[in-house]
Amino acid sequence: MAQAFQFELVSPERLLLSAQVTEVVIPGSEGYLTALAGHSPLMTTIMPGVVSVKLADGKSDSYVVFGGFADITPQGCTVLAESATHVDDIDPADIQRRIEHARKALDDASSNEHRTKAEIFLHQLMTLQGTIMPA
């Protein structure tokens, strides 16, 4: 059996989860990564996506996050999300609003750097939409 470690998922509004887990899959800025007990220290930004956790009791749970940071140590993992909600509570209209806002930001981009960042963010949101709300 995998060794358990402490995991916390925090948004500005509240603490969404604080539990002993055996595995956390995080949408890191360079791609999805899995944190396990004893993981090498790592701090990374996270992109919009789904954080999946496997609790110490064997149950699994998932949360939708919209950016933030992940701090992984050998003893635990903390995800500080800009915004987060349980996957069962996600509002499809909220995702669509975020996509429309990202499209507007892309249209209003004043430099190539801003345009590139806006394109990446829009793509991440559309990928997330397809992941949690398949056609």
Curated annotation (Swiss-Prot):
- One cellular-component annotation, GO: plasma membrane
Q: How does it sit in the membrane?
A: Peripheral membrane protein
This protein's UniProt keywords: ATP synthesis, Cell inner membrane, Cell membrane, CF(1), Hydrogen ion transport, Ion transport, Membrane, Transport
Look up the domain of life of the source: Bacteria
Chief localisation class? membrane
Q: Where does it reside? A: Cell inner membrane
Q: Which CDD domains match?
A: F1-ATPase_delta
Query: Which Pfam families is this protein grouped with?
Result: ATP-synt_DE_N (PF02823)
Which InterPro entries does the record cross-reference, listed alphabetically? ATP_synth_F1_dsu/esu, ATP_synth_F1_dsu/esu_N, ATPsynth_dsu/esu_N
Do the record's keywords include Repeat?
Answer: no
- Per UniProt, what is one GO molecular function of this protein? proton-transporting ATP synthase activity, rotational mechanism
> Tell me, what does this protein do in biology?
Produces ATP from ADP in the presence of a proton gradient across the membrane.
Family matches, as HAMAP family: ATP_synth_epsil_bac
Under the subunit heading, UniProt states: F-type ATPases have 2 components, CF(1) - the catalytic core - and CF(0) - the membrane proton channel. CF(1) has five subunits: alpha(3), beta(3), gamma(1), delta(1), epsilon(1). CF(0) has three main subunits: a, b and c.
Q: What family does this belong to?
A: Belongs to the ATPase epsilon chain family.
Instruction: Tell me what this protein is called.
Output: ATP synthase epsilon chain
UniProt organism field = Brucella anthropi (strain ATCC 49188 / DSM 6882 / CCUG 24695 / JCM 21032 / LMG 3331 / NBRC 15819 / NCTC 12168 / Alc 37) (Ochrobactrum anthropi)
> What taxonomic lineage is listed for the species of origin?
Bacteria, Pseudomonadati, Pseudomonadota, Alphaproteobacteria, Hyphomicrobiales
